[in-house]
Amino acid sequence: MVLAKDLKSGMTFLNGEKLLRVMEASHHKPGKGNTIMRMKLKDVRSGSTFDDTYRPEDKFEQAVIETVTAQYLYSMDDIANFMNNETYEQYEIPVEQVKDELLYVLENTDVKIQFYGTEVIGIQLPTTVVLEVTETQPSIKGATVTGSGKPATMETGLVVNVPDFVEVGTKLEINTQTGEYLKRA
């Protein structure tokens, strides 16, 4: 059991039948009354996010999440296919469940598949990925690193705001947590 006051960002717990992941958690002490925990939560099974409040002493069952390293193979007919790197077992995950993560993943990229018991609940990406720009506005002569930048479409369909000097064919390092351009690869 885990107390609400001990829940941190990234932790997964059970609230009744719902499997919830903490996106953000903060203590809030109103002028009158008791302290409350404000949390932004994600229902792992449905993918929906919502805000909720709990008393610090509320107890929840902490979910044991296991991960295995797997390689993304391909997506077809709304199913993303992955292969366990050790056992070569293949996993099929509905694209709808991992559509945001797939914007950062090329075929043959290693990711971590998360399990709750035998149920696949999602994938965990590496912190950064290298993707190639497939579409962007042409560079402007004299453009510098500073400035507002321009949108660029990556080979996976991800759209990232990049500096003006970036051209089609450039490989860029992208942060998978924020979706931001980091540097040229």
Swiss-Prot record:
<dbReference type="GO" id="GO:0003746">
    <property type="term" value="F:translation elongation factor activity"/>
</dbReference>
<comment type="pathway">
    <text>Protein biosynthesis; polypeptide chain elongation.</text>
</comment>
<dbReference type="Pfam" id="PF08207">
    <property type="entry name" value="EFP_N"/>
</dbReference>
<dbReference type="Pfam" id="PF01132">
    <property type="entry name" value="EFP"/>
</dbReference>
<keyword id="KW-0648">Protein biosynthesis</keyword>
<dbReference type="InterPro" id="IPR012340">
    <property type="entry name" value="NA-bd_OB-fold"/>
</dbReference>
<dbReference type="InterPro" id="IPR013852">
    <property type="entry name" value="Transl_elong_P/YeiP_CS"/>
</dbReference>
<dbReference type="Pfam" id="PF09285">
    <property type="entry name" value="Elong-fact-P_C"/>
</dbReference>
<dbReference type="InterPro" id="IPR020599">
    <property type="entry name" value="Transl_elong_fac_P/YeiP"/>
</dbReference>
<dbReference type="InterPro" id="IPR013185">
    <property type="entry name" value="Transl_elong_KOW-like"/>
</dbReference>
<keyword id="KW-0963">Cytoplasm</keyword>
<keyword id="KW-0251">Elongation factor</keyword>
<dbReference type="InterPro" id="IPR015365">
    <property type="entry name" value="Elong-fact-P_C"/>
</dbReference>
<comment type="function">
    <text>Involved in peptide bond synthesis. Stimulates efficient translation and peptide-bond synthesis on native or reconstituted 70S ribosomes in vitro. Probably functions indirectly by altering the affinity of the ribosome for aminoacyl-tRNA, thus increasing their reactivity as acceptors for peptidyl transferase.</text>
</comment>
<dbReference type="GO" id="GO:0005737">
    <property type="term" value="C:cytoplasm"/>
</dbReference>
<protein>
    <recommendedName>
        <fullName>Elongation factor P</fullName>
    </recommendedName>
</protein>
<dbReference type="InterPro" id="IPR014722">
    <property type="entry name" value="Rib_uL2_dom2"/>
</dbReference>
<dbReference type="InterPro" id="IPR001059">
    <property type="entry name" value="Transl_elong_P/YeiP_cen"/>
</dbReference>
<dbReference type="InterPro" id="IPR008991">
    <property type="entry name" value="Translation_prot_SH3-like_sf"/>
</dbReference>
<comment type="similarity">
    <text>Belongs to the elongation factor P family.</text>
</comment>
<dbReference type="GO" id="GO:0043043">
    <property type="term" value="P:peptide biosynthetic process"/>
</dbReference>
<dbReference type="InterPro" id="IPR011768">
    <property type="entry name" value="Transl_elongation_fac_P"/>
</dbReference>
